[in-house]
Amino acid sequence: TLRNAIDQALAADLGRFWWAGGKLRYRSFAPSVGAPYPVQAVRDNFAKAARTYGAEQRRRHGVRGNVTPHHAGVIAKTEFSTWEFLLDDEFMGRGLIWPKHLSVVFRGPWPARQAGAVLTQARDLVATLRDFRNRLFHHEPAWKRYGVLTEADALQHLQEKIGKAESLLALIHPENLRLLQANGLLRDAHRACTAGEIRRFQHLAQVHKVNSLGKLARLVDQSALENSALEARVYRGSQQRFLLIPS
């Protein structure tokens, strides 16, 4: 979502290959002086993405030699860090991509009136989520962090991360957040990070005996109100178990 928002804004202004040919200017530029780390990181990431795209095309289609870069193909191969680096203050200033395109990329309610403060908050959100994403991709415990000592600490930490994702989505465009809410994805994520779900997967959750439609209706209401998955047991000749999940 962030990738597409930035790409669409910059492509409309600087052309489809806006990252190439020196189009992406930065604040501290000086002749014969190397680019600062965030700027060089963006360049390196796009160069790597182009190589990855080319290698994939040669492998998939049996093409030899150079492969003509394809805008969407290169963008799709960029690392997530690319978009964090693009939010660096080096790209903020007169004639630069920020704040010129800030209101196009971040169409939701701004947390501050100053463009610089908005850019900083967006960058902090992305940095936090990138670190969390990397932890998940490397199969590290998602809940681990300094100061997390108890189950309650871990669950609060995970809920905070979901909140960060919601904040970033809302900042980019409220419609993005609305769609995820409508599909139940965020609700499911919040429910997954609860003590009730831990107990359920430990097979320690209460199993509710359903012996009437009234009891079933009350459990359905409870599940929806608490955003919880409830285990139910029904006897119809033999015992049958069901899971009630909000939809």
Residues covered by each model-derived region:
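Amphipathic alpha-helical interface elements
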Residues: 1-247
